[in-house]
Structure formats: C-alpha cells, structure tokens
Amino acid sequence: MVSTLKFNPSLKSRWNYLDFCKEILGSEYVITTENVIGALETATFETSQRVCFMVQPGSAKEVQECLKAAQQFEVPIYPISRGYNWGYGSKVPDESWSVVMDLSRLNQIKVDGKNATVTVGPGVSQQQLFEYLRSNYPHLLFSLTGSSPHSSVIGNALDAGYANGLNSIRWNHVISLEAILPSGEFLKTGFDGLSNASTAGLSHCGVGPDLKGLFRQSNLGIVTEMTIELRLLPEYLQMFYFSIDEEEQLDELIDQLQNLKQSGLIESNWILLHGYRILAEVSQFPWQKANEKQTLDRDLMLKLLREQEIPVWSGIYNGVFAVYSPTLRHAEAVKADIHEVLSHKVSRLQSFTVDKAQIQNLRFQHTLEVPEVTHRVLKGRLLTFAGIPVQGSVPMSYWRKKSPIPQVMDLDQDQCGFLWMAITAPSSGTDALNLVPVIEQFFTDYGFEPMIVLDGVNSREMYVMTSLVYAREVVGQDQKARQCFDRLATELRTMGYYQYRLPKPFSSVESLGKRKDDQTSILTKLQSCLLVGAKIQTFN
C-alpha cells in the first residue's frame, strides 16, 4: 500500500524527493504505507493536514543531506522526535503535504558523570535515559514530565515543556545544542564548536551571542543533539501532600508556597490539582450516576473522590511538592519549617521521607511497597519526583471513554479527545482566583470537567494547565472542544493571561494578538535569511 501521494500527480517534487531519500537512507527508512501515514495524520483533536510520506534519518549527516535536498526540491519538512506530543498536535504537521522527518533513530546518549551532564539525540526517550542512568550512573537524577515515559527529552525541552522536581523548566537547563539549518549548514552552540575547548558541554554561553535560543519553538533548524544538566540523586527525598476544601484558600496558600520557593526551602515545583483532575486519574466518568451531556456535578465529584480513599487528597484542590536533602538533619529541619508555615493554610497535610537506598531499590522495582504510601496515585507522584518513569497522568485521557483503559495507551489511535491549554501567570493567590472561576465557567458551559492544574515552576511564575478531555467518537465533541478552547483563550488574553505553548496544527503565534514591538518583522527577516528556498515547520 502507498500513501495518498500516489493520487496527487501535481506533487511531482515530492516524488523526486522521495526517490532521493531512498538513495540516501535506504528504502526501509522512507515510509509510504497507508497505516503509518494515517497515524501521522491523527491527533487527539480534529485536524485536516495530510502527509506525503515519512523519512527516518539515522545520523546528523543524513539529516543534513535530507534537508539540503528538501531545499532543492522545495519540500516542506516537519520534524518529530518520538511523536508523543499528545494534547498539542501529536505527529500532525502544521500544513498539508509535508514530509515528516522522524528523528527517533538519533538515540545516542553520552553522560559526563563528574559534571552531571548528559548529551542526547532527539530519539532518546525519558524511559531510555532513566534506564541508562540507572545502569551506568546511579548517582545521577533526571527530572521527568508527567507525560508518557516514551516521550522525547529534546522534543519536550524545545517546545517549552517542564518536569517535576529539580530543574523543572527544561530549557533553563539546556547547556548547548547541535542544529542543522535548511541550507545544510551545521551549528554547535557555546564552546562546543571550538577545537579542544575545555568547557565544551559545560558552559551555557560561548563568546558572542548565544544562538541556542533561536531553536526553541522555532522553525530555523533541526536540533540533532542537546546537552542538558542533571542532578545528583539526593540522600533524602521528602514528599509533602496537602489539600484544601475551599477555593478561597488558594489565595493565602499560593502566596505562602511562593514564599517557600523564594526562600529556597522548596527547590522543586509545587503542584495543585483540581479534584476533577485527580478523579480522572483514578477512574472514568460515572455513566450510571450522572448525565454524560453535562459537566459532572461538583458535589458528586467530591463524593466520588472521597470514595477513592486517597489519604490527604480529598479536597477541591490537592497539592504536592518534594524536598531534596543532602543530610537527615537538613531534611528534618526543612520539614519542621514547612509544617509550621503550611499547616494553617491547608485543610490536610502529610509528609514522609525516603532515603537514597529506598530510591535505588524503587528504580529497579517500582512496585516495592513504601509503608507511608497506601494509594497508587500518591505512589505515582513519589516515583515521578524521584525520577522514576510511570504512566503519569496519561490515564486521565480516557475519562470520557466508555471502554476500559487499555494496558498499552495510544491516545491518537484510541480516539481520546485531549487538548492542552497551557497558560502562564504570576505565582500569586490573587491571579489564581482571577483565573480559576473563568476557566470553570467556560468548561461548564461547554459540558467539560475543569481539570485544572496550578504548577509553581519557579518563585515568580506558575503554569495553569487545563485539559479538555472527551471522546472523539461522539459526534460534535471535536468542534465543541475547539470552540471552548478558542473562546477561553481569547477571554484569558483580555485578562492578560497568555499561552506559553500552543497546539500547533491550529494555533500560531499570530493567534496571541497584535504585539507592541517589532518581533514579527525581526523574525521574518531571520527566516528570510535562514530559510531561503526551504521550509521547516516548528519542531515537535
């Protein structure tokens, strides 16, 4: 079977490019089969883009050759790392009749154990890096996202992703990268491009402008390698779980969490999850108890959540963060300070400590019991903050599916409706109370559950992560989700709250509105210089 390309003779340049790629890569790495092409055209929300075919280079040199040829044949290229960009567009290109460049074969890993850095290719997943560190550098820790363990480390960093625990905002801990421009030109940032440089892979900036920022959420080149900071595995890891019963408590609680971040007592991110979000992680919609055409009633949601008997997490918002300590004395002192300042701001608070030996054991067998953790959803957070991959929040994508959650989850092929709205806001209780009611109102009006997450990624800023979750096979739900998304995004922008990450197949930077500077024209000039005769779409 062949792709739809066969039935579009006007796309002659794509045919010529296909033949060229077969010569360079070998026929087995130029994919035209219908089932693969169909998967590349499928996301967790409605899309219309079509794909010509897929190429799978196995080295930076092959990427370079494919890009130079794409420039010659004027073929648009859409790079993907591993394709687990669920909720933001999956593998679907920005425009139709693109050639998808799958970089999963570039899966090299190189660790500097002394300086705690790792250099990876775009095909390296969180799971692969975890296993490599566990076997070869057990003293090192890499922080994980809440997404699939099989998602790409580089892809997440380039698209403004963040992790749980230390080094939360990935991009802030990128030391250097290697990129190939559409012309085939080759770039190494920092000191990496200089011969015999002793701080190659160590220094964030070389001499002159730091060019690595040009490749974050951009189409100016394809990143084939990245060096990222790691952390030392802590001697002690403390987990703090807490919850509140009234939304009004968010005001003082978030301000106090911000103070704890600013003072340095909390180095990790803090997370506050709406009760709807927790319920969706541990169950599916109660079809026999509620009207499926409406948002699940809040009182019923809280009743069902409490029936799950999750210790501490039984409130309207349920929180977690971690403290990483070098000594037991440090751990005990920090615990006492945190309990003193937080206990009056929350309805429930619990903490416990695991030591390095326990973490090492969990790395090899994450099913081992931890006496202080009696529920799997709390155990999952412990593992994530300890840098141990689990399925994270992926099961919540099946909340509105009438079929059971499968053992192997593929959100695209299982027709899970899932759409992320990723908002940046000041880390303050006032802003939380401004945002939350608006999000809840829009979701309720459209019949979706407001699965809100407030995430304190640093001492100044919090991410407000809201997901539209539905079943795509239900007629009209794709359109309803899109309408809710667009209207809510517009309303939040009028309030001063913008998205920091966009679902690429139907959103663009232009959708954020008119700028008050000349960035658009400056970026256009950069693109005109670097993208002559070629077109790379935003890195996925």
Where are the language model's segments positioned?
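Conserved glycine-rich FAD pyrophosphate-binding loop
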Residues: 5-9, 44-53, 75, 80-81, ...
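Short amphipathic alpha-helices in soluble, non-transmembrane regions
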Residues: 17, 69-70, 256-257, 331-345, ...
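Conserved oxyanion/phosphate-binding beta-strand-loop segments in alpha/beta enzyme cores
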Residues: 20-42
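Long, structured ligand/cofactor-binding scaffold of large enzymes
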Residues: 41-140, 151-164
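Helix N-cap motif at beta-to-alpha junctions
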Residues: 58-60, 247-248, 323-332, 428, ...
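FAD-binding subdomain of flavoenzyme oxidoreductases
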Residues: 108-110, 122, 127-263
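C-terminal cap/substrate-recognition region of VAO/PCMH-type FAD-linked oxidoreductases
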Residues: 211, 227-228, 238-249, 253-393
